[in-house]
Amino acid sequence: MTRYFLAAGLLAAPAPTPPAAFYTTYSYTGYTVVDLTTGVPPTQVPGVGGTLALRADGTYDKRLSLLMGDSGPRMFAQHGRFTTTADSIVFRFTDLKGPDAQRGTYRYVAKTRRLTITLDGYPTGNKGVYELVATAPATGR
């Protein structure tokens, strides 16, 4: 009998899933680039805008705009699937080069409905940090 309790205790609890309010549309409020190859401090990119829709069915739509100096805003659109495990997030999509994935971590603060996504960059150690806030109250689906 004791070994059954021991075996049950060794089984890991499933990783928590995000709350229902996590699945919504967010507005980008900030983007910081961390480039360890340059020796300069993290750079906050000006003129960040757009939305990120995360759906409970695992699909997402990203529409990001960045102000790129005198050339004006640059628009990025990306559609695909995402998964979360504990604090990890993976975005899978297909672009002109074929299937790809962006990996990183996320932190969701339910009280303020703020989301921070940190995506791994290249070379290893570089990263992009995105700050977002939910655009509307959760629908409770």
Language-model regions, residue ranges each:
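Lipid interaction determinants
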Residues: 14-77, 85-141
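Sec-dependent N-terminal signal peptides
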Residues: 4-12
